[in-house]
């Protein structure tokens, strides 16, 4: 066997020439100090604002403060394994999360990692969490209803697709219940509605108890609503940076549907806790505090998040993202800093009151203080026809009720108004987990405003409504289908509906 020296030397030369080409270039820095979920890092001169960095042990962080001599990094995870002198690597990527239909039915953390034990998520696409909201040109004014299934909201404070409607109230007034019922109300459309009407739901839990989030997921699962929902959870035991990031992560997941011509609904529960987490991070990063020790850009924090909910025009796929942010007030104080900020950003608010809740008026919506700035353009014509008068009647009823406390001798007209108001208030009550379809709401409210309840005792109103709906669902399906298809009460439908209610009222008495 002869050894060809020339051949071997050529191979060796070739290998030496290509050696070391694949050396990994990564810019690194050193931890100067760490504590309270914040690390100060020396080096990383070219790091971008909002870029992911990696600590030893795979813990991620995000560069937020870029100062002349160091970088302030918030840590997504436990900081107890990070020590002074540790090496920090740049990843070169701005913080992003997985998006797409693969996430439906899953519970994830603020970085999109699954926390429900159902295996990895094989998403085909990732998106940045913090992107610019759509401009003015790609948008269209809100005109399709986003039905919540709650009479008090769909009739009086309608929410449209692409709207941002704030749910505000003290603790334990049923804020989360409104979001949950809205999610459950989408079930019939997902089961047998057209694809273009389907509404995908995202629920972002910020700073909630784990037991509360688990309960929420359990209800969604039991009622078959988890299959079109995504739950993003940054619970009370998660570090502040995760609670700060969760709403943006959820929003990016919702935007995937919006930008693909579909419809999504996102509930942020709740933004007061996100603001508190952001305040904690800002103070630890030594940013100057402002009112109530919140940083100066806490308004911008919420406005850039909520501006991303939009209705896009037909050239851009006609998709929409509807936002239901939640704010928890202290002692019904709507004029505190964060509540006023979010009220001024959103297109209306649903104001829930403790007093109403304890009086048994649930959902505890204060109809006087709640508004929808989109209004009736987010209702179908049939609902406009029946609900037009109900708001005025309830307002008159509230005014009269305040006076009636003083005087006992009231004339017949006032008495009639008070009676009607009491029955309409009773009619707007609704138990949890029982959302109604729009056509059913129209039928019930039609009965209310046309005096069918005036002769009944107040405690009979609920039974009357139940019976009427049962009768319509079995014997008069054509009326409900007519309203659903026509989306308006034509004279023919009105006559049929009137006949159906008349027949039922006779048998009920």
UniProtKB/Swiss-Prot annotation:
- List each coiled-coil range: none
Keywords on this record?
ATP synthesis, ATP-binding, Cell inner membrane, Cell membrane, CF(1), Hydrogen ion transport, Ion transport, Membrane, Nucleotide-binding, Translocase, Transport
Enzyme Commission identifier(s): 7.1.2.2
Report residues binding ATP: 169-176
Note the topology in the membrane: Peripheral membrane protein
Compartments where found: Cell inner membrane
Which catalysed reactions does the entry list for this protein?
A: ATP + H2O + 4 H(+)(in) = ADP + phosphate + 5 H(+)(out)
InterPro entries (alphabetical): ATP_synth_asu-like_sf, ATP_synth_asu_C, ATP_synth_asu_C_sf, ATP_synth_F1_a_nt-bd_dom, ATP_synth_F1_asu, ATPase_a/bsu_AS, ATPase_F1/V1/A1_a/bsu_N, ATPase_F1/V1/A1_a/bsu_N_sf
Superkingdom is Bacteria
What Pfam families does its record include?
A: ATP-synt_ab, ATP-synt_ab_C, ATP-synt_ab_N
> Site positions for Required for activity, renumbered to this chain?
370
> Predominant location of this chain?
membrane
Molecular-function annotations in GO = ADP binding; ATP binding; proton-transporting ATP synthase activity, rotational mechanism
What's one GO-annotated cellular component? Answer: proton-transporting ATP synthase complex
Family the entry assigns? Belongs to the ATPase alpha/beta chains family.
Role summary: Produces ATP from ADP in the presence of a proton gradient across the membrane. The alpha chain is a regulatory subunit.
Q: How does it assemble?
A: F-type ATPases have 2 components, CF(1) - the catalytic core - and CF(0) - the membrane proton channel. CF(1) has five subunits: alpha(3), beta(3), gamma(1), delta(1), epsilon(1). CF(0) has three main subunits: a(1), b(2) and c(9-12). The alpha and beta chains form an alternating ring which encloses part of the gamma chain. CF(1) is attached to CF(0) by a central stalk formed by the gamma and epsilon chains, while a peripheral stalk is formed by the delta and b chains.
The name on file for this protein is: ATP synthase subunit alpha
């Amino acid at each position: 066997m002869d050894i060809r020296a020339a051949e071997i030397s050529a191979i060796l030369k070739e290998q030496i020439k290509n050696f070391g080409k694949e050396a990994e270039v990564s810019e690194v820095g050193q931890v100067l100090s760490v504590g309270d979920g914040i690390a100060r890092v020396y080096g990383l001169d070219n790091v971008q604002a909002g870029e992911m960095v990696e600590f030893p042990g795979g813990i991620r962080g995000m560069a937020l403060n870029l100062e002349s001599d160091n970088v302030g990094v918030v840590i997504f995870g436990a900081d107890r394994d990070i020590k002074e002198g540790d090496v920090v690597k740049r990843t070169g990527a701005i913080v992003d999360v997985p998006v797409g239909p693969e996430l439906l039915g899953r519970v994830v953390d603020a970085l999109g990692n699954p926390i429900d034990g159902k295996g990895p998520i094989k998403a085909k696409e990732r998106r940045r969490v913090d992107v610019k909201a759509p401009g003015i040109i790609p948008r269209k004014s809100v005109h399709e209803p986003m039905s919540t299934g709650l009479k008090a909201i769909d009739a009086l404070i309608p929410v449209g697709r692409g709207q941002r409607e704030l749910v505000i109230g003290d603790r334990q007034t049923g804020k989360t219940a409104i979001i949950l019922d809205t999610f459950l109300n989408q079930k019939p459309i997902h089961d047998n509605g057209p694809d273009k009407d389907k509404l995908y739901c995202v629920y972002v839990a910020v700073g909630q108890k784990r037991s509360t989030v688990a309960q929420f997921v359990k209800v969604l699962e039991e009622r078959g609503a988890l299959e079109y929902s995504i739950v993003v959870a940054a619970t009370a035991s998660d570090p502040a940076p995760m609670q700060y990031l969760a709403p943006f992560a959820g929003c990016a997941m919702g935007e995937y549907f919006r930008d693909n011509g579909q419809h999504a609904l996102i509930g942020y529960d709740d933004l007061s806790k996100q603001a508190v987490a952001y305040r904690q991070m800002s103070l630890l990063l030594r940013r100057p505090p402002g009112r109530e020790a919140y940083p100066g850009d806490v308004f911008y924090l919420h406005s850039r998040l909520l501006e991303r909910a939009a209705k896009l025009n037909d050239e851009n796929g006609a998709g929409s993202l509807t936002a239901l942010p939640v704010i928890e007030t202290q002692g019904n104080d709507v004029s505190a800093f964060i509540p006023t900020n979010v009220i001024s950003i959103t297109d209306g608010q649903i104001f829930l009151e403790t007093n109403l809740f304890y009086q048994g008026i649930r959902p505890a919506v204060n109809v006087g203080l709640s508004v929808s700035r989109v209004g009736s353009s987010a209702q179908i014509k049939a609902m406009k026809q029946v609900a037009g008068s109900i708001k005025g009647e309830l307002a008159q009823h509230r005014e009269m009720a305040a006076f009636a406390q003083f005087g006992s001798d009231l004339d017949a007209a006032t008495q009639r108004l008070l009676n009607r108001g009491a029955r309409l208030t009773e009619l707007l009550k609704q138990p949890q987990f029982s959302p109604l379809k729009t056509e059913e709401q129209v039928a019930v409210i039609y009965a209310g405003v046309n005096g069918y309840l005036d002769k009944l005792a107040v405690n009979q109103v609920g039974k009357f409504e139940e019976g009427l709906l049962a009768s319509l669902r079995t014997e008069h399906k054509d009326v409900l289908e007519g309203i659903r298809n026509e989306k308006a009460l034509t004279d023919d439908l009105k006559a049929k509906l009137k006949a159906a209610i008349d027949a039922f009222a006779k048998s009920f008495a």
